[in-house]
Regions:
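Secretory-pathway ectodomains
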Residues: 1-7, 12-14
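Extended, charge-rich alpha-helical interface modules
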Residues: 12, 16-152
């Protein structure tokens, strides 16, 4: 099944292949599979939410680069696709929560709603870390993200 991001990806690869130059030295660093898929999911959300043409071009450029890395390095399976959908859903929730927190900030409303939203950030980040860890475990990532916070 082809989704809108696969089609957009294929169309944009051709557009940006000739435009992708790096005026500064490229920084290449190993990252975990979970981190890569997390970043790609965030870029897909940005492509959907951010409408500025200039911003879209920058997001598309990064998206294409990271999708190429995914295509070259990650063997997809139904489980990985499911985990990608889950991490994207968590990141969409975080996007909405962060926007609502900013609205509270704008109104200087730091009451019950602000506290609930603030707590939702770390609950969602904990889910996100768990999904990334599962992706890393399944794919045998060399690098694994370690998180340790006080229990709640």
């Amino acid at each position: 099944m082809i989704n809108i991001f696969d089609i957009r990806y294929l169309n944009l690869v051709n557009q940006f292949n000739t435009q992708m130059t790096n005026k500064s030295k490229k920084i290449l660093s190993e990252i975990s599979a979970g981190e890569l898929l997390d970043k790609i999911s965030i870029l897909e959300i940005k492509l959907d939410k951010i409408k500025s043409k200039d911003s879209q071009e920058e997001i598309n450029k990064e998206y294409i680069i990271l999708k190429k890395a995914q295509d070259l390095n990650i063997k997809s399976s139904e489980k990985i696709k499911q985990l990608f959908r889950e991490i994207k859903e968590v990141n969409q929730n975080l996007w909405e929560v962060e926007n609502r927190i900013r609205m509270c900030e704008k109104k200087k409303d730091f009451g019950k709603k602000f506290i609930e939203l603030s707590r939702a950030v770390y609950f969602n980040n904990d889910k996100r870390a768990k999904i990334k860890s599962e992706i890393n475990e399944i794919l045998g990532s060399n690098i694994k993200e370690i998180k340790q916070y006080a229990d709640y």
